[in-house]
Amino acid sequence: MGPRVSTSILADRLTGMIGPRASVARGVLDQHGQSESHYRNLPPDIVVFPETTQEVADIVKLCASAGMPIVPFGAGTSLEGNAAAVAGGVCFDFVRMNKVLTVHESDMDVVVQPGITRKQLNAELRGTGLFFPIDPGADASIGGMTSTRASGTMAVRYGTMKDNVMALEVVLADGRVIRTARRARKSAAGYDLTRMFVGAEGTLGVITEVTLKVHPVPQAISAAVCSFDTLHDAVDTAISVIQSAIPVARIELLDDVMMRGINAYAKLGYREAPTLFFEFHGSETSVAEQAEAAQAIAADHRGHGFAWAKAQEDRSRLWHARDNTLYAGLGLRPGARAVITDVCVPISRLAECLTETRRDADEHGFTAPIVGHVGDGNFHMLILIDPAKPDEAEGAKALQARMVARAIAMDGTCTGEHGIGLGKIDYLADELGEAVDVMKSIKTALDPDGLMNPGKIFASGVHA
């Protein structure tokens, strides 16, 4: 790598390569410095809109020769500053690489470009009898979901991105293009490079193609909602449902604070208490059996008002409330900013971790609703702060640190599905110890000049 060239020189070269699909317009740059996270705007120097893998490879080579950082960008829905251009550089926006390349219906897999969103993918799959179930809530891009090892509401039944990504096409820091695997459902051939790039947040290479498992659309779907007097009762119900081998598709927890926000935001009348939202997939008979079994377990744990939602309209209304928890939470404190964080613990420790975290937030005076994918021990907290009060930001940071320390002490993780990004760098060594040095060795081997999404996962001295 030579010395970093000026932005104007590189912009001219990129314009010569891809024309107006290279932009230095201030509005475009600012748009790509933002995300759903609470971090300040960190825009790139240039934004490019590639259309093919070859274009990505050519631009990566040009960036490498110019010493210019490379930052992949999907839908801008990340929550830990994962796509922030902390060192400037060139942002690769994949909005034009948003196609389904191949659908293998018999094999139940698809090959897609990274810019397609999960909703776009499922719209393309309509009519095939297949669907892609990973649902992080936001309409995230498949490339972004892959890069952050995303999860979501149906992970308890269908797994996370690491379970559903079969193979990748990746452009490395030197412009080489590799395929990490074939389409076979299993392989013992060499290192598992696919898993290595899933969750790497663009720090090892740029993903240009993703092969995904897809699943049969269930014959029948039913949903249900049930409230509880305590978080413990709600979590114990969820654990009992899982341990009873009921193949629940979703089991989501909203605490009393979040239910208050949901009612106000969506004009609903739910009981403002810890509440479980369920969804069941299968045949008509099996769905009815699953729901009845879950209802009996909820009753054993003092559940209130177990209500079914069988009609599509009723299910949509129920899950619309769950999917809008960010905006419902923000409505609890108008004008506030949400510091969103997540942890994941073994489900046997979930009730303890949730209860202690709820108590911690309350004792420190924070409005901080909680929502969790309790089937796999993952929960999120939205810490609402006044952006004009630095002491609140510091308090939120301390609250998050205690939440993470609590999870790690319970043999959990500092992030269940948001990734490390900028926000969790300080906790990675606490969780993984000397394994972080191995990660750094891999990073150095694949990206010796440190140009691939710098400042993410590992500290670079630049902080938001």
Where do the language-model regions lie?
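Noncatalytic alpha-helical scaffold of FAD-dependent oxidoreductases
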Residues: M1-A464
